Regions:
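Amphipathic, charge-rich alpha-helical segments that serve as recognition/docking helices
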Residues: 1-9
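Class I S-adenosyl-L-methionine-dependent methyltransferase catalytic core
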Residues: 10-199, 203-248
Length: 248
């Protein structure tokens, strides 16, 4: 697997030493897993060293409850920028996330995204080109292997003063979560752009937390939908961790 900088130079991907295997997200069992884990809004879960809250990234009290007084080194996230949009044949269109979640049927306000950045030192925001972000010297580009009806690449806005980079990986199956990023992409981001803890306020099916676990980092994850919290708990449990409700 290779990466390339903005000048086209191709470099070898960083190598991981025996990472913990990812069992993958069981999206098709989301409702069943919610019953198993009994996930509800307001819960905070301790997942090994990680923290996962079923909460709302728009609410300051939820963010502060999740982070306590910690200041992660990096916010890496993939915020929703449009919902309930499907293409012919049932495939996901360009603007999507959690299409079955009525309460998230909106575009994340710009001020929410700006506020979230204040909790960390740096940020990588996938889909940042859909917002009015400050100029950035370092854009990350994911060359996608999926359906030809979708865009060829996705862009991530960053706060870094570094050359832009492009990540390319072989085709891998769609896992059922509409904005899911491949694990290898997130591992690549964390390996190259973060040395400390990670904050993901739109955790989805938990891939950022998996990447953090593989690299020995701590992830603070927020997800508004209880069933996706359950998917993440099951996924992390499959990696040998024992999730428990905070304070119990």
């Amino acid at each position: 697997m290779l990466e390339a900088d903005a000048n086209g130079e191709r470099l070898p991907m960083p190598d991981l030493t025996e990472p913990v295997e990812d069992p993958g997200p069981q999206i098709d069992r989301a409702d069943e897993l919610r019953e198993k884990w009994q996930t509800e809004r307001g819960q905070v879960w301790e997942v090994g060293r990680h923290r996962l809250m079923c909460g709302d990234a728009r609410e300051q009290v939820d963010i502060e409850t999740l982070l306590l007084l910690e200041r992660p080194a990096l916010m890496m996230t993939d915020p929703p920028y449009g919902l309930n949009k499907r293409m012919a044949g049932g495939t996901w269109g360009l603007a999507y996330r959690h299409s079955d979640m009525d309460e998230w049927d909106y575009v994340v306000p710009q001020e929410t995204l700006d506020n979230l950045q204040s909790y960390t030192s740096n940020a990588i925001i996938w889909g940042g080109n859909h917002y009015y972000m400050k100029p950035s010297r370092c854009w990350l580009i994911w060359k996608k292997p999926y359906l030809p009806t979708l865009s060829d690449v996705e862009l991530a806005w960053t706060t870094f003063d570094k050359p832009s980079k492009c990540y390319e990986n072989s085709r891998q199956p769609f896992d059922g979560h509409p904005t899911s990023k491949p694990l290898g992409l997130l591992v690549w981001c964390l390996t190259n752009y973060a040395t400390g803890d990670i904050f993901d306020p739109f955790l989805g099916s938990g891939t950022t937390m998996v990447a953090a676990e593989q690299l020995g980092r701590i992830c603070y994850g927020m997800e508004i939908e209880p069933k996706y919290v359950a998917v993440t708990l099951e996924r992390m449990s499959g990696m040998g961790l024992e999730p428990k409700l905070a304070g119990r």
